[in-house]
Design a protein with these regions (language model features):
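Substrate-contacting helices/loops that form the catalytic groove of nucleic-acid
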Residues: 180-215, 272-301
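A cytosolic small-molecule/anion-sensing beta-strand core signal
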Residues: 242
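Active-site loops and adjacent core secondary-structure elements that bind or stabilize anionic groups
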Residues: 1-204, 219-237
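Glycine- and Gly-Pro-enriched alpha-helical subdomains that act as flexible
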Residues: 78-116, 247-302
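Short, surface-exposed loop/turn motifs that are enriched in glycine and acidic residues
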Residues: 42-43, 212-215, 249-253
Length: 302
């Protein structure tokens, strides 16, 4: 396979959104791309997921001060979270109770674990340097690739051997700032607008217009996580957040009502996965992780 090893002004891609859309590339009008592909050959959709998810985790880290991770599929997040310690129940339903977890690994365990069916084959974004614990967690899941500001040597070695050596590993310059004006072409017509630079943090929550002024810090944190997640979710979009992680995301629905139902149903499933009957299901030995996820979803839905 062809691998990109260094930063460049442009990268030629195999094809665009669909195999018939050729030629395809990503490029900069000025300067070099702020990325280095350390392994694999990411495609058009991979890069869309990578760049959108990176912005999400970067903003989560800036807003909360905690390591953040996102699980992206088809240019919307399936999960997003910060590195808050997991209790034993969540470790079990996320299938990470056999692994040592760093704060960054915990963030990805939460992001991946919230909606495991949607996260199957995801693209991962990490706010901090990918460590060995996070790489080991990524290595056991079906995934297309990862973007992070850096990788420890141990983590990079693990990821380079994933998917028979073709796993996509992207390093991004965390100091990169895009131009304040962005462009998009549709049907040969160019749209121009200022970037969405709104800063979503607790400074937005200083004025509480209700009789009760009680607003717990945990609730503020979760509200900010929801807002940042929705900033990078295709509209219409709805997000339920609890304890530092999205537990149900509805994306790209024409109806806000249907979108709310979709996100709410995912949140319901997240809660029901913690029921003792689900946690104690008798699994056959060596069942595939995807088969286990699908079975749990069907069992709960019935």
């Amino acid at each position: 396979p062809k691998y990109y090893k260094t930063m460049a002004k442009e990268l030629e891609l195999k094809y665009g959104c669909n195999p018939n859309q050729k030629p395809s590339r990503i490029f900069m009008q000025e300067g070099e791309l702020p990325i280095e592909v350390l392994n694999g050959r990411p495609g058009y959709i991979n890069f869309l997921d990578a760049f959108n998810s990176w912005q999400l985790v970067k903003e989560l880290k800036e807003a909360t001060g905690l390591p953040a991770a996102a699980s992206f599929k088809h240019v919307s997040p399936a999960g997003a979270a910060v590195g808050i310690e997991l209790n034993d129940t969540l470790k079990k339903i996320y299938f990470v109770n056999d692994l040592p977890l760093t704060p960054l690994a915990t963030a990805y365990a939460r992001a991946r674990g919230a909606d495991r069916m949607s996260s199957y084959g995801d693209f991962i974004a990490l706010s901090d340097t990918c460590d060995e614990a996070t790489a080991r967690l990524i290595n056991r899941e079906v995934s297309d690739g990862v973007i992070a500001p850096d990788y420890t040597p141990e983590a990079l070695e693990i990821l380079k051997n994933k998917r028979k050596g073709t796993y996509n590993v992207i390093k991004i310059d965390p100091a990169y700032c895009p131009a304040p004006i962005e462009h998009k072409d549709v049907f040969g017509i160019t749209f121009e607008q200022g970037r969405n630079e709104i800063r979503l943090d607790e400074s937005l929550l200083t004025h509480i217009p209700t009789k009760s002024q009680h607003f717990p810090d945990e609730a503020k944190r979760d509200l900010i996580i929801a807002l940042i997640t929705l900033k990078y979710t295709q509209s219409n979009s709805v997000c339920y957040v609890k304890d530092g992680q999205a537990i149900g995301i509805g994306a790209g629905q024409q109806s806000r009502i249907h979108c709310t139902r979709l996100a709410g149903n995912k949140a319901d499933i997240w809660y029901l996965r913690q029921h003792p009957k689900v946690m104690n299901l008798p699994w056959v030995e060596k069942i595939r992780r995807a088969d286990r996820d699908n079975t749990i979803d069907v069992y709960i839905s019935d």
